């Protein structure tokens, strides 16, 4: 099954934070911070602004940083994804 986002939406595969600290301490699930990085796996077709179609800036394969509590969490085939609006993406990691 695939996710095909609509409009200005983007599907991001969440990159989980490290489970072990630099000092070797293993973090329980409740102590880990909510992830804010991911890889773009699908993008929508863009949105219309003042009657003109505006393409999205992000593309498949981009590694991005997004707002901490943005988007809708989706679990598909055992993988975690976020369905975000492009405006929820703060930066592309180059």
From Swiss-Prot:
InterPro entries: Chaperonin_GroES (IPR020818), Chaperonin_GroES_sf (IPR037124), Chaprnonin_Cpn10_CS (IPR018369), GroES-like_sf (IPR011032). GO terms for cellular component: cytoplasm. One of its GO terms (biological process) is chaperone cofactor-dependent protein refolding. Belongs to the GroES chaperonin family. Together with the chaperonin GroEL, plays an essential role in assisting protein folding. The GroEL-GroES system forms a nano-cage that allows encapsulation of the non-native substrate proteins and provides a physical environment optimized to promote and accelerate protein folding. GroES binds to the apical surface of the GroEL ring, thereby capping the opening of the GroEL channel. PANTHER family: 10 KDA HEAT SHOCK PROTEIN, CO-CHAPERONIN GROES. This is Co-chaperonin GroES. It comes from Thermoanaerobacter brockii (Thermoanaerobium brockii).
């Amino acid at each position: 099954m695939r996710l095909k986002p609509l409009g200005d939406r983007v599907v991001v595969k969440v990159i989980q934070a490290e489970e072990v600290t630099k000092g070797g301490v293993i973090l329980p699930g409740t102590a880990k911070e909510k992830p804010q990085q991911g890889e773009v796996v699908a993008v929508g077709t863009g949105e219309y602004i003042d009657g003109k179609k505006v393409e999205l800036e992000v593309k498949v394969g981009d590694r991005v940083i997004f707002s901490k509590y943005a988007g809708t969490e989706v679990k598909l085939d055992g993988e975690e994804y976020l369905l975000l609006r492009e405006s929820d993406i703060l930066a592309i990691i180059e």
